[in-house]
Each structure stands twice: as structure tokens, then as C-alpha cells.
């Protein structure tokens, strides 16, 4: 490791390049999975062919389980449905910033960011604004790069997600994620 927190070379699990690449694959897969379940269609989002290694599959499955739990939170679904998407960029960045405003970073909040992005993509699909899908993914990855990258590196890369949610209490954490997202949406609605 050099002094910046990055591993020397570009291939390590905590390198900026690898974290962003894995994050893009996970976000793409998460959004395609959610869209396929909700809209019956899978948007064409392929940036590159996602890796088929066991680690990425485990991470994707972990995200899928959490997404399924969040889908069953009716209060959260109602609040997301009420979000005005006339200015989606402003909505996305305000909610994303509110999620991390207290300076506390954890995997639950990272997953909440992915979940919120997937819900905005589903709204774009429903309103037939497909060009917005790649834009939302870009915003999410920009936010990840600018605000979360160093924290993810400090957690050992994306593998930290598995240890965080790999415990039997992941359902409890899912409730926490829903709470963070609900609180962020509430703050945004009061300010907006």
C-alpha cells in the first residue's frame, strides 16, 4: 500500500480503479435485476461484460436479498413513489447527500444509495425516459467516486459488504437502511 490508501498497481481489491469497476458492475446488475422484476423488461445497461467470479456473484446476491427486503417496506415504497422526478438530478444528489450528511458511512447506506438509484431508473422506465437510466447510473457512480471511494477502500474493497451483511442480522440492517432512506426522503421533501 502507498500512503494514499491505494494498493500499488491497479488490480488489488482496494484500488480506486477496481472499486469503481466492481461498483459499476454491481450497480448495473442491481438495476437490471430490479427492473426485470418490476417492469418485466431489462433495460440495456451493459457497460462491459460483468465478471462471473464467485465473489461478484456473492456480492450481487447479497444486494438482491437486501433489495427484496426493501421492496417489502410499504412506507419506503410510498415515499419513493411520491418523489417528484421533474428534476431528477437535484432529487438524486440531495437525497444522496442527506444519506451521508452526518459523516457516518456504512454498507447499509451504500446499499440504500444503489436502491434509490434503481427506483429512479424504474420511474424513468415507467415514464418512457430511457436516456435517463444511464444518466442516473452515472450520477450514482460519480457520487461513489467523490464521496464513498476512500471509505470503501478503508473497508477492504467491496468484500467488506459481504462481511457486513453476511451475519444473521442482515434483516436488522435492512430495516436500518430503509430508515436512512426514509429519513433522507423526508428531509428532502421538507426542504423541497
UniProtKB/Swiss-Prot annotation:
InterPro entries membership: Bcl-2-like_sf, Bcl-2_BH1-3, Bcl-2_fam, Bcl2-like, Bcl2_BH1_motif_CS, Bcl2_BH2_motif_CS, Bcl2_BH3_motif_CS
Position of sequence motif BH1: 98-118
PTM text: Ubiquitinated in the absence of XRCC6/Ku70. Ubiquitinated on Lys-128 and Lys-190. 'Lys-63'-linked polyubiquitin chains on Lys-128 are removed by USP12.
Tissue expression per record: Expressed in a wide variety of tissues.
GO molecular function, one term: channel activity
One Gene Ontology cellular component: nuclear envelope
Record-listed cross-link Glycyl lysine isopeptide (Lys-Gly) (interchain with G-Cter in ubiquitin), residues: 128, 190
UniProt keyword list: Acetylation, Apoptosis, Cytoplasm, Host-virus interaction, Isopeptide bond, Membrane, Mitochondrion, Mitochondrion outer membrane, Nucleus, Transmembrane, Transmembrane helix, Ubl conjugation
Biological process, per Gene Ontology: apoptotic mitochondrial changes; apoptotic process; apoptotic process involved in blood vessel morphogenesis; apoptotic process involved in embryonic digit morphogenesis; apoptotic process involved in mammary gland involution; apoptotic signaling pathway; B cell apoptotic process; B cell homeostasis
SUPFAM superfamilies: Bcl-2 inhibitors of programmed cell death
Short sequence motif BH3: positions: 59-73
Pfam families recorded: Bcl-2
Identification of the protein by name: Apoptosis regulator BAX
Organism from which the protein derives: Mus musculus (Mouse)
